[in-house]
Amino acid sequence: MVRAAVGEWNDGCVLDVAVKAGTLHFVAQRVTAIILVFLGLWFAGSIKGLDVLAHGVVVVFIADPLNVFLLTLLTVTLAYHSYLGVQVVIDDYVHAKRITVASHIASRLAHVLFAIAAIYAIIRIGLVA
């Protein structure tokens, strides 16, 4: 029985599915973290020379099509990476089944709403300016 828990006996049971899901979650966290490093460096370098207190300067920066794409990619990646992290915290520290389910639903909803609002703002500024 202990061997099955560590995955030495693989007969296609539920354990195999759980292991694959855990591996995908682990890989997704690492990949999004690497992407965020590069996008974060791009963003920091891009706004370094800008007068970020001047509304017009920021609008012109966001209106560039490349910046619209990269800001949207940054937003989606950040929201997904954050969602993955919050999911781990909920799974590790919330033990009541109903609260766990409610927390997962609330987390997913909050992250999706954040991403939609941010993408809407980026695209709206990109189209108007």
Where would I find each of the regions flagged by the language model?
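Membrane-embedded alpha-helical bundles that constitute the cytochrome b-like, heme-associated redox core
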Residues: M1-A129
